[in-house]
A protein has these predicted regions:
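Non-heme Fe(II)/2-oxoglutarate
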Residues: 1-78, 83
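Catalytic core of non-heme Fe(II) oxygenases with the double-stranded beta-helix
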Residues: 70-127
Length: 127
């Protein structure tokens, strides 16, 4: 398996996302809602309602960055991006070891991106 790790977002873009994703009255849902059979057994997190204006706005920013990133284009040749999700884990929550489904409701998912908005010392797990 190949991995590409690099800085996709600049500090200003990260701050924009953090500001939008920490608005008080956002609709966070049980992460199991979009998990496949295996993943649902180990998924204990929250994800932002993908139909919300904030989710669509933030997804648009990230999708534009991915599709215009020279390194990503040379590594993966993405044609389109679908299924952008924003997740968070509160105290005691985690997403255990799993494999993402190759087919999701919006199409085939050959690539997966994880974009962290905080420094790595703020996270545990996910290795």
């Amino acid at each position: 398996m190949n991995y590409l790790t690099h800085q996709l977002l600049n500090p200003q873009e990260i701050n924009i996302l953090k500001k939008n994703l920490t608005i008080k009255d956002l609709s966070w849902e049980d992460g199991k809602k979009t998990a496949g059979n295996h993943a649902a057994k180990v998924k204990n997190n929250l994800q932002l309602d993908r139909s919300s204006n904030i989710s669509r706005k933030c997804a648009g920013l990230i999708e534009k960055k991915i599709l215009n990133d020279v390194l990503i284009k040379s590594f993966a040749l993405p044609k389109r991006i679908h299924g952008t999700m924003f997740t968070k884990s509160l105290k005691g929550m985690k997403y255990g070891r799993h494999i993402d489904n190759a087919f999701m409701s919006s199409g085939r998912a050959d690539l997966s991106f994880t974009i962290f908005l905080n420094e790595k010392d703020k996270y545990s797990g996910g290795e």
